[in-house]
């Protein structure tokens, strides 16, 4: 999907796309009657423009400051009905509209000079169990940390989503949702039961539609499109429902349970001691290990690692990760490091930490704005390890001296396991043979 077509999100693009997926007149509108009545009033709707003191907080809360936008106004919304209203207003006025949830997108799909209206989902953060759908309902503005905390404390379950607790569920799920537990449990979208999404039909009417994975659901295609088809492409998601394909009425059996504890680690290799040969050996060993252990029957599925091949001026090549196992975690990590370091004459430094699972999942303190980042990121999936020629090119660019910026690099994430048990066409995330995810 090109950047241009993604950016068409909710103007012409949405109208055309949804008209193809959801036949007007046959859709079940998600009635927003449940919004509010006997509950405390939700925030919004508020149309925040330049003169409003909230404007700056709302308009500039994106993670990647390489891209900036200055929308005419930002909608604060608290219910699905508010989102429908915001979308309708943008359609009627012809304003280019987009949506922001956690603000952790890498590209300029939200922060862009061409965007006129932003719907900000950050006040819609509910996480609850919906007995009618036998699934966990998560509002799109929730951050992953909110989701982990509430699902785990409430029912002892989780979804295998990303490592950064600040990422928004709104955009994350639409890209597949990959994290430290995915080798054990699959992608987040493998547990997605339904979405509620605000779309605009061919007559220019905004409305909310619920699409489920039920084979009999006439909107099943719309559900499928939300299992990796890309964020902001088909409409504004207001709510997700999660349930692993499973039977039973006990909520604690409807999603996977994480381990009680994890072993978190950070391993680093001093760049000064890594020459061309030992660097190549380390990368080759890592690729071989990932290939060997990407099958669903690997005994190392609990081990997740991110090897960061940084630029030499940064000082160290490092690997962070966790072993999500209640027993045998130290042994697994020792064996992993030994396999990577075979023939590498540099002893890595290896701090480790035993943590309760929830503490590890919440690392990164949601809400902390942290440093300002300006990034350009590309990603890809590898079935096989890098060839020697590719490793040579990597080494050249990471060590070249005609460019002295310490930033930049290539990160290699262990992949596969349970992710690779799902058919490529079962969801809109077709990469089901990879051994490494690369950023
Ligand atoms: C520090 C960091 C760590 C990350 N870690 C991981 C990881 O471990 N695993 C992983 O898989 N990914 C990871 N990502 C990538 C992340 O999942 C995506 O960038 C995701 O799109 C961010 O979602 P967001 O809601 O936070 O971002 P936003 O900037 O709010 O949105 C990103 C995109 O999604 C669209 N969008 C947002 N909300 C909605 C909605 N409600 N309905 C429709 N479209 C919407 C936006 O319009 C935009 O195009 C990480 C990103 C960062 C910056």
Model segments located where?
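Loop/turn elements at helix/coil->beta-strand transitions in domains of secreted/extracellular proteins
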Residues: 92-96, 114-115, 154-158, 233, ...
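Glycine-/small-residue-rich beta-strand-loop submotif within the FAD-binding core of flavoenzymes
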Residues: 65, 110-139, 180, 184-185, ...
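Short, structural beta-strand-to-alpha-helix junction motif
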Residues: 134-138, 142-152, 168-169, 353-357
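Cofactor-binding catalytic cores of oxidoreductases
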Residues: 36-63, 102, 107-110, 252-439
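C-terminal region of N-terminal signal peptides and the immediate post-cleavage residues
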Residues: 19-37
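Glycine-rich N-terminal segment of FAD-binding domains in flavoprotein oxidoreductases
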Residues: 52, 63-124
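FAD-binding subdomain of flavoenzyme oxidoreductases
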Residues: 161, 166-270
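N-terminal secretory signal peptides and thylakoid transit peptides that target proteins
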Residues: 1-17
């Amino acid at each position: 999907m090109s950047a241009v077509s993604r950016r068409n999100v909710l103007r012409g693009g949405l109208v055309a796309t949804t008209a193809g997926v959801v036949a007007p007149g046959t859709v079940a509108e998600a009635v927003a009657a449940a919004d509010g009545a006997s509950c405390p009033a939700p925030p919004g709707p508020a149309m925040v423009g330049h003169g409003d003191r909230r404007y700056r907080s709302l308009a500039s809360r994106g993670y990647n400051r390489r891209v900036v936008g200055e929308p005419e106004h930002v909608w604060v919304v608290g219910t699905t009905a508010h989102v429908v209203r915001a979308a309708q207003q943008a359609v009627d006025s012809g304003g280019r509209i987009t949506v922001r949830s956690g603000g952790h997108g890498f590209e300029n799909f939200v922060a862009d000079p061409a965007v006129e209206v932003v719907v900000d989902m950050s006040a819609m953060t509910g996480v609850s169990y919906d007995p009618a759908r036998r699934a966990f309902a998560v509002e799109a503005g929730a951050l992953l940390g909110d989701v982990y905390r509430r699902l785990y404390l409430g029912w002892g379950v989780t979804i295998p989503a990303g490592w950064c607790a600040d990422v928004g569920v709104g955009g994350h799920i639409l890209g597949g949702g990959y994290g430290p537990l995915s080798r054990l449990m699959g992608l987040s979208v493998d547990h997605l039961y339904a979405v509620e999404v605000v779309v605009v039909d061919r007559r220019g009417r905004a409305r909310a539609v619920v699409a489920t994975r039920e084979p009999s659901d006439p909107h099943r295609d719309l559900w499928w499109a939300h299992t990796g088809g890309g964020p902001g492409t088909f409409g504004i998601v207001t709510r997700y429902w999660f349930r692993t394909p499973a039977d039973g009425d006990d909520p604690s059996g409807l999603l996977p349970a994480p381990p009680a504890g994890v072993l978190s680690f950070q391993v680093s290799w001093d760049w000064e001691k890594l020459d061309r040969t030992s660097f190549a050996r380390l990368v080759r060993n890592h690729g071989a290990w990932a290939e060997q252990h990407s099958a669903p029957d690997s005994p190392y599925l609990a081990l997740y690692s991110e090897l960061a091949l940084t630029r030499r001026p940064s000082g160290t090549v490092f690997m962070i990760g966790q072993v999500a196992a209640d027993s045998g975690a130290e042994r697994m990590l020792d064996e992993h490091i030994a396999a990577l370091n075979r023939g590498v004459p540099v002893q890595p430094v290896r701090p480790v930490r035993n943590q309760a699972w929830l503490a590890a999942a919440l690392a990164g303190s949601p809400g902390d704005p942290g440093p300002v980042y300006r990034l350009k990121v590309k990603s890809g999936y590898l079935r096989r390890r890098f060839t020697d020629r590719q490793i040579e090119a990597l080494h050249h660019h990471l060590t070249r001296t005609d460019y002295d910026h310490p930033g930049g690099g290539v990160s290699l994430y262990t992949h596969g396991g349970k992710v690779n048990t799902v058919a490529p066409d079962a969801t809109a995330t077709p990469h089901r043979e990879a051994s490494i995810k690369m950023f």
